UniProtKB/Swiss-Prot annotation:
Pfam families: ABC_tran (PF00005). SUPFAM superfamilies: P-loop containing nucleoside triphosphate hydrolases. One of its GO terms (biological process) is SOS response. The UvrABC repair system catalyzes the recognition and processing of DNA lesions. UvrA is an ATPase and a DNA-binding protein. A damage recognition complex composed of 2 UvrA and 2 UvrB subunits scans DNA for abnormalities. When the presence of a lesion has been verified by UvrB, the UvrA molecules dissociate. InterPro entries: ABC_transporter-like_ATP-bd, ABC_transporter-like_CS, P-loop_NTPase, UvrA. The lineage of its organism: Bacteria, Pseudomonadati, Pseudomonadota, Betaproteobacteria, Neisseriales. This is UvrABC system protein A. A zinc finger (C4-type) spans 359-385. Keywords: ATP-binding, Cytoplasm, DNA damage, DNA excision, DNA repair, DNA-binding, Excision nuclease, Metal-binding, Nucleotide-binding, Repeat, SOS response, Zinc, Zinc-finger. Belongs to the ABC transporter superfamily. UvrA family.
Length: 569
């Protein structure tokens, strides 16, 4: 048990290296022969060659595999099983993955779709399947395939329940249960449960108002044109499946990086551009960027901020109040009340990170961790402070009739009204409300925030700062887990950041975000290695990309632009 605990603590600093076997093959003596497939440059293929191919290429190989004579007859059932299962994986949008891909490198959405493909292959009936946002990370083309797969599961005689924000998924459903009316304490009720058409006709449903077009995310009346003098140029990007890509990124604009899954978006932006900028601007030395030859224009920026969906903290002590800097002035207010001064309490008395005012039984966590060894750890409320984090003496100090625990239990909206007369607090709390987090509690544990909520807390922190207008913000699918109304709020925040002169780069599949961009860089045409992806196939305004032949993003974008309303000037 002790060894397991030690391994868990050391795991974050482990480095994975390729084993020194011939071509890192793992199993390098197994061979398969294919005489007809044009993919083969020789008659024999080693097992590790096949497992390293994209699934689409692997499927083509097995479909054309000719073993000859009775060997073909013996292998027929096995080959049928292999091709069917590969087909299921491709139909859920995973054509760019390889069989050798390590499970720990898969995103949550990819892992979920692999499990979905295995269920389709099992052919079970009478099963209830529950999926939580399966569209995460999927291009619109792959999303259509996914919806077809879910309908196939239903047609087999199963029940399919999907928690989803995607408009196409909602419209494709047989039955929709809409929760609300708001988020957090303002939600929790079933507003309406009916067909998508009935949902769209429901005035009380925010989802329905967006489905009916009464509420909408508008196309901007005027897009910010690119300035040829303000360009960031990255040359020779060749990491993973990138084909010697030259990226010309206009600064001061909102730029969307698009393309089907596996086309190289994350490699180009997260693994190459972001790491170069973090190394050269932020003086970060942790990670080396993927291969490239040259970068020009970084002198026009002073820092890069990667606003991702990673947690804002990994312990119960981390919360929105501590992350955004709201907690320090709150503690100063409590330390300044007359009773605190009489007792000699300073600001540290109201911290749950140091001894003095905190509950020592739980060391200010409010909960106790129970290690389960082979299962996720369980947190139970502290029996001494009952989750209040502080000792009795500290909780006796009141500010405007509330103790420190009661303030941390307030929602952002309640705290904004409570501290309205304190400009420092009011301004920071307003930014949290601006990004749609009015329902979150100030002291809510970081471990309970979703990825989308954590990302918006980070955006709120950036909004509250005074900046120089020379910052590069990188966001990777910020719409994950967001409702239409939340996306509208997110776009308002991004517009404010851009309005200060900053540059925004967004890796995104959501067409409502893409259509509002000033500039689009589309990668593809397909995903994976070989001739699949890794090239820039279209760039320009959304209208330019929509008119580009051969761009899947352009095909879907043209339909959205034709059916969307333009904002009033």
């Amino acid at each position: 048990a002790r060894a397991i605990r030690v391994h868990g603590k050391l795991e974050p600093i482990y480095v994975e290296t390729v084993a020194e076997l011939p071509e890192a093959s793992r199993l390098y003596t197994v061979r398969a022969r294919c005489e007809r497939s044009p993919l083969c440059v020789c008659r024999w293929r080693k097992f590790h060659h096949i497992s390293a191919w994209p699934l689409s290429k692997t499927l083509d190989f097995f479909q054309n595999l000719d073993l000859g004579g009775n060997k073909q007859q013996i292998a027929e059932k096995v080959l049928k099983e292999i091709t069917e299962r590969l087909g299921f994986l491709i139909n859920v949008g995973l054509n760019y993955l390889s069989l050798a891909r390590s499970a720990e490198t898969l995103s949550g959405g990819e892992a979920q779709r692999i499990r979905l493909a295995s269920q389709i292959g099992s052919g079970l009936t009478g099963v209830m399947y529950v999926l939580d946002e399966p569209s995460i990370g999927l291009h619109q083309r792959d999303n259509d395939r996914l919806l077809g797969t879910l309908k196939h599961l239903r047609d087999l005689g199963n029940s399919v329940i999907v928690v989803e924000h995607d408009e196409d998924a909602i419209r494709a459903a047989d039955y929709v249960v809409d929760m609300g009316p708001g988020a957090g304490e303002l939600g929790g009720a079933v507003l309406i449960a009916d067909t998508p058409e009935k949902i769209a006709a429901c005035e009380q449903s925010i989802t329905g108002r967006y489905l009916s077009g009464k509420e909408a995310i508008y196309i901007p009346a005027q897009r910010t044109p690119k300035d040829a003098e303000r360009m960031l140029v990255l040359k020779g990007a060749s990491g993973q499946n990138l084909k010697d890509v030259t990226l010309e990124l206009p600064l001061g604009l909102m730029t969307c990086i698009t393309g089907v899954s596996g086309s190289g978006k994350s490699t180009l932006i997260n693994d190459t551009l972001a790491k170069i900028a973090q190394r050269d601007l932020n003086r970060a030395t942790k990670d080396e960027p993927s291969p490239y030859t040259e970068i020009q224009g970084l002198e026009q920026l002073d820092k890069v901020i990667n606003v991702d969906q990673s947690p804002i903290g990994r312990t119960p002590r981390s919360n929105p109040a501590t992350y955004t800097g709201v907690f320090t002035p709150i503690r100063e207010l409590f330390a300044g009340v007359p009773v605190s001064r009489e007792r000699g309490y300073n600001v540290g008395r109201f911290s749950f990170n140091v001894k003095g005012g905190r509950c020592e039984a739980c060391q200010g966590d409010g909960v106790l961790k129970v290690e389960m060894h082979f299962l996720p750890d369980v947190y139970v409320p502290c029996e001494v402070c009952h989750g209040k984090r502080y000792n009795r003496e500290t909780l006796e100090i009141l500010y405007k009739g509330k103790n420190i625990h009661q303030v941390l239990e307030m929602t952002v909206a309640e705290a904004h009204a409570f501290f309205e007369a304190v400009p420092t607090l009011s301004r920071k709390l307003q930014t949290l409300m601006d990004v749609g987090l009015s329902y979150v509690r100030l002291g809510q544990s970081a471990t309970t925030l979703s990825g989308g909520e954590a990302q918006r807390v980070k955006l709120a922190l950036e909004l509250s700062k005074r900046d120089t207008g020379r910052t590069l913000y990188i966001l990777d699918e910020p719409t994950t887990g967001l409702h239409f109304a939340d996306i509208a709020l997110l776009l308002e925040v991004i517009t404010r950041l851009k309005g200060k002169g900053n540059s925004i780069v967004i890796i995104e599949h959501n067409l409502d975000v893409i259509k509002t961009a000033d500039y689009i860089i589309d990668l593809g045409p397909e995903g994976g290695d070989g001739d699949g992806g890794g090239r820039i196939i279209a760039q320009g305004t959304p209208e330019d990309v929509a008119a580009t032949a051969g761009s899947y993003t352009g095909q879907y974008l043209s339909q959205v632009l034709a059916n969307s309303q333009t904002a009033a000037v």
